Amino acid sequence: MAPSQHPKSAAAPATTSDQMSTASSRPTNGTAHTSAETAYPSSMTDSKPTQSGPGSRASDEQDADEAYSNHSEQHMDHSNPDGHPSKPSGRKKKKKAKKGRAGSQTLGDESSTPLSTPSVSMSHPLPPPLPPHLGTRTILKSAKDRSIWNTSTQEERENIKTFWLELGEEERRQLVKVEKDAVLKKMKEQQKHSCSCTVCGRKRTAIEEELEVLYDAYYEELEQYANNNQGSFEKGSPIVPPPRLYQPPLRSPGQHTRTQGQFHPSRGRIHEITEDEEDLEEDYDDEEEDDDEPYSDDEFEDEETRAARADFFAFGNSLTVKDGILTVADDLLKNDGKHFIDMMEQLAERRMQREEDTQYNIAAAHQSLHSGHNHPPYDEEDYDDEEDEEYDSQEEDDYDEDEMDTMTEEQRMEEGRRMFQIFAARMFEQRVLTAYREKVAEQRQQKLIEELMEEQTRTEQKNAKKAREAEKRKEKKRLQKQAKEEEKARREAEKAAEEAAAKAEQEKKLEEQRRKREEQRKKREAERKAQEEERARKEAEKQRRLREERERQAEAERKHREQKEQEKKKREEARRKEREERELREKKAKEERERKAQEDQKKANQETPETKRTSHLGPVPIPANLQPQGSSSHLQSPHLQSASPAVPKAPTPAKARQPSQQGSHGSSPRSQQASTEPFHTSISPRSMAPSQSSGASSVASKQGYGQQPMLHHPQPSTPLSPLGSVNRSLPPGFASAGLPSNPPGLPGMVPRPPIGHELPTYPPHSGPLMNQLRGFPAPNGIPIPPGINGTRPLAPGRGFPLEAAPGLPFHTQQPIAGAFASHQGGMSHGHSRQPSGSFERSPLEPHAQPFPISRPSPIKRPPSTQQEQSDANRATQRDVDNLSAQLGSSALLDDTDIPFTSNLSQSLPGATAPGSLPGPTRASFGAPSLFPDPLASKPGGFPMGPGVGANTWGTQIPFVSSAFPGAPAWGTAHGSGWSNNAFGSGGHHRAHTSRPVAIRLLVIQACKQLDTMSSSKAGSGYHDVKIVLQQVEQLRPSNEPSIPLKEMLDICDTEGNTQNGGGSFSIKKDETGEFVKFEPDNNSAASGHRGSIVPGEIGSPVPSSSMPAFGGIGNTPSVLRQFSSPTGF
């Protein structure tokens, strides 16, 4: 019997170690052993060993304790203090290791003895004392438990027992029913995923029936226990302790180095319980409280300690029932229940097998436990490690098949039922304990609420008492304060009465003082008013005198101005008459000269028909009706054709006029024009050097047909005679050789004189070979635009103009005599000394070209005499002297006539010289020059001839270096077809102005016209704005948009200056309407008579050459001319 006592003797330490496995205390050496009485009641430790047998109550409770320990262990393992499930593997293994360590210390030398199957008459020895490392922790833990639920005392256990007995039958049945329903629900949920065959369906039905039977029997036992007040759960046959079928020998400590994954904690805690159900509930509660701590310090123990305690697991494995009955609580608490379902399936299979075949042997029954209907194996996580280890250890340790066959089928079934009853009892205990705790918690909560209410009531009473005392103190203070305030009010009333009396006396004194000051103030005010009236009267008198003085001065100035204007009108009328007479004389003289020239030309053409072949002289101009018609599409050779239809007469040189008579008129702006009278020029071939002629002839012989000879050969150094040539030209308005003198679409333009009419003092850049003279087309007949080919450079400092090339037609038409007459332009005379007697030809003189040596033509009689020319020059000179006396520097001395801010174009309008076109002013759009100068005149003595050739671009005139003495700077000669200016040649036209300026000028002009036409507002100068707008609309060009009244009034508010007409507008409104008046000043057009120039006056353009531009507001040359933008000097 000695060996059989080892398991029983080790049961108590195992139970104790499982209860305290979660205590977080490290092992301490030297701690005295503490008796079990400190942790357990005397009823558990002092009981004597009892007989354990089939009918023993102690053996039944040992088995029940085993099931309960498994249940509580798994419950605490998978439920953290916060209520969340923990990981199922790690925590369980740690608890197993700790339990193994706790139990291994109590085995000692007995661990080497193999365990045997316990006998029926097994006895229980007293449990050994607690291990030294658990004593202190157990005491502290018990104190903690008592402080929370106080379930370790006998009184508390009695309370639990009383609570159970006080429950009614319906409440007890309800607890059992809840337990049964939970298990059935779990079973059904687990069976959902199994197969739906007939066998499995029968198995499920058997499981449910088995559960019904088990729970019904369990409830009957509970009723008997409650009615009989017994200490056990059953009254019938006692629960037989589980047979120890498979008991492997204990292993040495060296074989358990990996205890955490190889072994499992004990699934049964076998200790002696002499008390009733409340003792078991106490054990369960202690373990549950101990297990709240998530970690334990025992986990940090070294491997040697773990290995030394690992052999305790062998004993724990030996207590595990084969069919896994003790793991049902673990499965249910893990919400898994697979092992419990497996057990129930086995029970159902056993039941079915008994019904079907009672002849099966034990081996077949054992195999049916593991191979029921080929279900898939459970998940590795769902399998408890203790099953794996116990089955492995059972297989490794050579199970005794003979012992396994000794148990009958009925014993196994009975064993299963008893294990289920133990499990159900433990689960039911938990529910009873939970119900009890809920009741206690509710009672304590109610008690706490009552205490809180009492506390609150006491606090309220205390606060009310304090409030009453404070109210009393406040009332007392209020009464004291009220008495003080009444006393203070009485004193203040007395003081106020005294102050009121004093204040009344003071007010009386102040009122007397104010009355005296008011009287003094009124007196001073009267004196100051009288002084101001006297001062205002004096100021008004002074202003009246000043106004009268200004009026007298203005009247005197007006009279003076009117007198000057009358004198000016008289002078201008005299000038106009003189000019008309002069023009008439010039016209007659011009007609006489033209008639003589035509007669001389006819005579020359009749007398020398054969001279043209050898003379190589240029043709003289002949009338268009005498010009032979012919056409040529190419340039002719310098060698003249033998079959020329017309041979011009070579002009005869006349005696040069002395320039001394020019000196007296040097200050006149028209002196250059008047002093430069044209004369005939006779250039004989004998004047050319033989070397030049011979050298040029060889060069000319090499030129291709239609090419122009080079013009850059050295020229003779003889000076050019200042004699001018006789004007030989067609009358104005006739075309040369039947070609139009104006471009198509531009009628009315007067052609300019031929080439050489106005050449500058300084030459332009030299051009290429072709088109040396502007106006001559290229050999292919296409005219070259201006600026491509230029003339050959003149000698620096010379102002000599070009002459037409006699006899060399540079155009595609037949040579025209009238278009190539030799003309000598007027020179710019800077001094009056006698020029050199040498003859120096111009560098661009066409006669300087090489010609072949031939017989000279006979000298003929000159067409006019020196006496006739002198008479004509004297008549012209008198006219220029007259003009110089009135339009010279003396015209600039009158400040009233010409304002200081006016342009030069206002004071000195250009006068037209006899026989030439008037020069355009600065404001002219149609000016052919780039920088025209109204002070300069055109070289005189040239007739109004037609254009030269058929060049549509016009004859290009070289650039001039000065703005005053010369002619236009970069213009074209009139009559050449197209002008360089895109707007054509014309009269006085304004420069580009903005619309507000143009509208203001139109309003000024409209007001002036209305001043002369009507006497509205009694001659005050105010005109209705609508009438003014109508007048402006009449003056507005048709191509400009209409002018609204608001825009005109807005522009009238602008200040006047030299650009927009000057002056100012006065606008006034009354009941009849709105009126406007223009008040001129020094910058306005009304300040002098020169602002408006009408045709026929001195400086006015010839009406035939005054052509308006194509666009722009206002075709009013008289107004816009004097406000043109100034040109550069």
From Swiss-Prot:
Compositional bias segments (type: Basic residues): 89-101
Domain of life: Eukaryota
Pfam families, A to Z: NST1
InterPro entries listed in its UniProt record: Fungal_stress_NST1, NST1
Subcellular location: Cytoplasm
Annotated coiled-coil segments of the chain: 441-608
Low complexity bias (residue ranges): 626-673, 687-701
Keywords, in A-Z order: Coiled coil, Cytoplasm, Stress response
Compositional bias of kind Basic and acidic residues: 72-85, 453-473, 482-613
Ranges of Acidic residues composition bias in the record: 274-304, 379-408
Ranges of biased composition (kind: Polar residues): 14-54, 103-122, 254-263, 674-685, 718-728, 865-875
Skewed-composition ranges (Pro residues): 741-754
GO cellular component: cytoplasm
Region of interest called Disordered, as start-end residue ranges on this chain: 1-136, 229-307, 361-413, 453-879, 903-937
Stated role: May act as a negative regulator of salt tolerance.
Annotated family: Belongs to the NST1 family.
Protein name per the record: Stress response protein nst1
Upper classification of the organism: Eukaryota, Fungi, Dikarya, Ascomycota, Pezizomycotina
Gene behind the chain: nst1
